[in-house]
Amino acid sequence: MSSKISDIWYTFCPVVCVSHIAQDKGWLKEEFAKDRIKLSHISTLPVKDWQSHFTHKHRQLFRDGGNIPPIWTRSEGVDTKVIGMVWAEGGQAILVRKNSLIKSVKELAGKRIALPRRLPNLIDFRRATAKRGIIMSLKAHGLTPDDVQFVDLPIDIPDIATETQPPERTGWAISPETGWQIPQQPEVEALQNGEVAAIYSFHGREVILEQLGVARIIYNLDKHPDWKYRVNIGYPYICTVNADFAREHPGLVTRWMKVLVRAGMWAKENYAEVVRIMAKATDVPEEVVQKSYSTDFHKHLVPEISERGIEALETEKRFLKEHGFINNDFDVRNWVDRSFLDTAFKEVEVETRQ
């Protein structure tokens, strides 16, 4: 017999995931308030518990966002379940200096490309994201990693909470002309001083860098026709939950997914509002969201679980294992549990007909 739940915690990456809509509109809190269940962000917990965004050690936690930390967590033996996925089309690019003569990725043969390394991190998801994005961009142009030189850029400040210290948002500066925050300062500095010829950027940062004249996009990986090339931290974004919690409280997990399904359906008809919510969630201007993501990205925020998604997670896991970001293998298909989402869709359909 499951115990009664009075609190649920949540944590969402600052990315384009449907949970931000449900949270912004108050729909999640509204749903669980019916049973006097309080929803709280993990930042309301002691600092040492903030690591749950990456470790998933907090039992009553829903997480939504990039797939690399959850893959790492599962590889470390933490029993979680993937209960939903969304596909954000956009936001992966290779950039060079604004005045560089380089016009295509093919011209990067023999050149140096920046690869950030956050030394204290539990899982260096930014490095993993950049490395896969660069390698797949090279592959799309007939090149391999052996054709370029990766330049490590060590960053010794963690962006994951420690036992006593909150995460720090490092690598950002303020543009005096626009007031916009300039991301990826270590990479930008290496680019501008000639230490490297190119950098990888994603999640709208590439648009900011080009808009501010800091760098120039020479390739958008998200435009590649084969979706397998685009697999990365945000392709797909995934929603995860502690497996024991899900087994003991399947009704609560289903209700959570029902709210996300309805939020995704609402998003299809509300582009401008979705842009506003995502700009706020990702801490960038609205025009950056509009330029970084496809014009119909708001129509692809309904959670799903598909064979494509399972294959994408298997591809990502295999990449992380081959490149030393995770140590242990696991069964992706067994990690994914579609039962909650299937039930959520059925109940939403019935309720819509009433």
Residue ranges and their predicted role:
Residues 1-6, 351-354:
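Short, low-complexity disordered leader/linker segments with a strong preference
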Residues 247-325:
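Secondary-structure end/capping motifs
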